[in-house]
Amino acid sequence: MDGLECSEVLFSEIKNDNEKYRFDSEFFQKKFLMAYDIIKSQPYSTIENEYSCLTDFHANGSYEHIAQNYTLLDNKDYAYMVRTTDLEANDFVNNVKYVSKSTYDFLSKSKVFGGEVLINKIGSPGRSFLMPNLNMPVSLGMNLFMIRLKNDATIDTTTLWLYLNTSIGSTIVKRKINGTVPLTIDKAAIKSIYIPCFSNVFRNILIMMVKAANEKDKQAKESYVKAENILRNILEINQNNSSNISIKNMSESFLDSGRLDAEYYQPKYDELFTSLKKHTTQLLGGKDGIVIIKKSIEPGSDSYCDEGIPFVRVSNVTKYGISEPSIKLPRNIVAEPDKLYPKRNTILFSKDGSVGIAYKMEKDTEVITSGALLHLTVKNPLEILPDYLTLVLNSPIVQLQAERDSNGAIIQHWKPSDIENVVIPILDIKTQREIASKVQDSFALRRKSEQLSEYAKQAVEMAIEQGEDAALAWLKERSGE
């Protein structure tokens, strides 16, 4: 029995909180039973007793009926459709989807107003998010559940979201996940989740903390936009040229680039390079380039596991940061995995899928990135600041070059040889520092936002385990941070 875990459960208790009548050992692991014992030792309820609405995209009708009335749009339209990828990135502006008014009205059973708790069905099943108020019509995307609570519920959505993201809450949710590939969670499981009951005083403090965190996050985005505007105003890049006629002779087209497709020669690209010629520029990679480019590994899904080294994919990366990876890799995936860990000031740059996303590492981090993320290291960071370069890589200057090079592919792929030849404008060091300062202000505000949210989650966990008084005292000690 050495190394084995045993749980002794009375037969009469097997059906408790077991709506699927599971009898497997996984369901009765000690960590699950202990989490339940902690919640049930104090006042508690279930989501079923507290919600006024638990719905999803498919509540609007059969697959066939929905398909006849639903079209997902890339360009801005009447209503925004919230997806897991947007929630993970905490970005509701870039690379988002929309639906028309007729589609929004058809999807009447899954309208989102802000303040709801959204829960993943698959992918990272059970992962929860607090939906912000976007001040526009919003429709719920596929593969998400939405919970709206009663007016007289014993818990509010902010506290529910915090609880579901604590160690105890996530353990209870994890017990409800079923299936093999893909793992899923269903409505019945969501309804049965046990939740703790707290005093109004404690919950109001948590709500204020999360509001403060959201305000810091808003300020962080505003600071980043200021940095983007400095670059945009100096370079005067126009990415909205709608002209689609371009006349080229053979020496200016195929003989020069090897491309014959019309998309490659759109006037907006000519306008971009004409604007760049007004400034000092340098190629991104190559012998005389700005950076050294290194590749990571692509281990394949057979190597994915629940414990080990976090595996960062393109879907985890935005210009604002890296979301918590749900996939891990074995620690023996390669002989010396630490050589794959990105170091401080390394710029992660996506070449597949959503191409051209850049994020600069704020510190040495023990993660392994997908082969779709290149590692860029600035050769001379005193002349070209990594924060400045990262902002340029995320700007229309580089996004237009990515669009031109990868156009026409069903799955976007940006060849490393093309990435090496990306043209980067080099502004004077004073302007670079001004831009970098705004970027650093943005990330400092974001860290403060994340810290406040983390403190609120820890306070919920402490209140469950030690009582509200202990949690409030702990928060008071950190009020000056």
Annotate the PLM regions.
Residues 48-70, 85-114, 283-300, 315-344:
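Sequence-specific dsDNA recognition surfaces
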Residues 137-145, 178-201, 367-374, 408-431:
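A short glycine-rich beta-alpha junction/loop motif
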Residues 83, 108-110, 121-163, 338, ...:
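A short beta-sheet element
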Residues 1-66, 199-297, 429-481:
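Non-catalytic DNA-recognition/assembly elements of restriction-modification systems
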Residues 130, 135, 158, 169-176, ...:
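Conserved, well-structured beta-alpha core segment at the onset of a catalytic domain
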Residues 157-185, 387-414:
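Short, positively charged
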Residues 80-83, 117-120, 310-313, 342, ...:
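Short hydrophobic-aromatic micro-motifs
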